């Protein structure tokens, strides 16, 4: 005999008592309304694992030396170590590597034409970065031109950068056609043949 009960029928139960036992998962009563009720386990505020296991030390003071080392590590090198090069004054090493490569085409009279391999340091010496160009930067007067444009007062309406920098096209580039292209009437269109 096959039963649909959750637990099999014990042997002590008589065979004539064959009512099926319903499982506890059967929904009875006002299960829809009871399902929407929120029952809190405790009235206390829930505690996280960190809060439960945290041990306070009231007389603890933070380690200032560790903080100082961490702060120095995050800040990195100071400005004088990043910018200064062999104690040169700042007005003499203003040429960047980009400017040297693209505008001056690698011209540096202080460097020999060929580099040699140093087996002890495992480097090609001398490096270009060790001998920076000691001259003012190549700016082609762009800074002075921009400063002059910003300092001269302009009278009249204010214009956007796009309007002021957009050149007016020549008159020959304009189209002199005053009317739209004529469209033939519908009666002159050929009928489609299927």
UniProtKB/Swiss-Prot annotation:
UniProt-listed Pfam families: CFAP107 (PF22595)
Subcellular location: Cytoplasm, Cytoskeleton, Cilium axoneme; Cytoplasm, Cytoskeleton, Flagellum axoneme
Region ranges (Mn 2): 95-107
Region (Mn 1): 45-60
Record carries keyword Cell division: no
Tree of life domain: Eukaryota
Cytoplasm as UniProt keyword: yes
Tissue occurrence: Expressed in airway epithelial cells.
GO cellular component: axonemal A tubule inner sheath; axonemal microtubule; sperm flagellum
Keyword vocabulary terms for this entry: Cell projection, Cilium, Cytoplasm, Cytoskeleton, Flagellum
Primary localization: cytoplasm
InterPro entries: CFAP107 (IPR054709), CFAP68/107 (IPR037662)
Biological processes annotated in GO: flagellated sperm motility
Protein task: Microtubule inner protein (MIP) part of the dynein-decorated doublet microtubules (DMTs) in cilia axoneme, which is required for motile cilia beating.
Oligomer status and interactors: Microtubule inner protein component of sperm flagellar doublet microtubules.
Protein name (Swiss-Prot/TrEMBL): Cilia- and flagella-associated protein 107
Organism placement in taxonomy: Eukaryota, Metazoa, Chordata, Craniata, Vertebrata
